[in-house]
């Protein structure tokens, strides 16, 4: 009996022990309970480490591949060229790779914003632009799908923002900070900025254009004033009166912008942009409000295109009351409305109905015809085209209008295929260029994937003068 009671007591003791709370296991990094502030991880160049390579990557020799330093395993570091490694606690530049044989410049890292889902296209295009200028060493270090940004490394000092289609913004990347302490993000960010020299025209705090990025907006609104106050106290930002354009405005425009990009709350990318080689809007997004009278949201696409492609003087000169336009694929009238509101007479070509104020507007002539077969009786100032078809077919149509002298300016959309987007766009746009060159027509062509574009890009084409 005593033995039985002892056994029961031991059993009860074991049962009691199992009821005690246990420390939960997790695959993520443990949160430190120390009172001292954690030290952030910041990127700096790592020394090259030769490695054997069986098959060189396209565009690289075996010698190039062997000279590449090893990669590192952190999430942010995978986005960088393989010459970058984390260190503590010093802050060092990220873009100082060993110089490539035959090149006079070290690798420069660029941060590109883009529409989520187009990171590969954005990167491919940027690297292609660099290689088209001269034989260069260019890398696509890594891509986070649907992140809304990409990082490329090339041994060229400059990319041309105006010639990039998928990039919303072009920023030269200087520092990457990881493991930002939750209670004091300001100190490491200021330390990284202090590694840069000079004064900045303004500071932009930005986040990815994703659902996760939008959750950081409240944080940047709180953090921004603290950082700006600290930088002004150090004399790193222009005085408020200069920034507002009340004095020395011309000099202010020459200064670089400072960008602090937060992929998440624990990481920050520090970069600068050239005001003459970048987008002039926060996050590279030109936002538009929906007009109450517009018949469809497609009107926002053309409104953004006009703001992006034409400066104020060009808008005044090229979009004058009394001009004429043809809108192919016009229904329900979103693009036509942008012309009509400026007093431009529109011939709307579409088998579908026009809606709202455009249904019986005195400046709109609605023709129920096929946009690909329509030919104007006389030349017009503007051709608008937002028809859904293969980019090569639409490009051929646009070329016909310019070669035949039916229009002088055009804004049109090219719908993107599911695969080989950059290749398809290059073929379509180069087809237009080749035709106009053969005809001796001087022109201006700019293409961008706008904020209001989805699986498409928007193109501005303008005839200047015959050669």
Indicate where each model-derived feature is located.
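SAM-dependent transferase fold signal centered on methyltransferase-like domains
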Residues: 2-6, 18-21, 34-35, 51-54, ...
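Intrinsically disordered, low-complexity, repeat-rich polar/charged segments
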Residues: 11-12, 26-28, 38-40
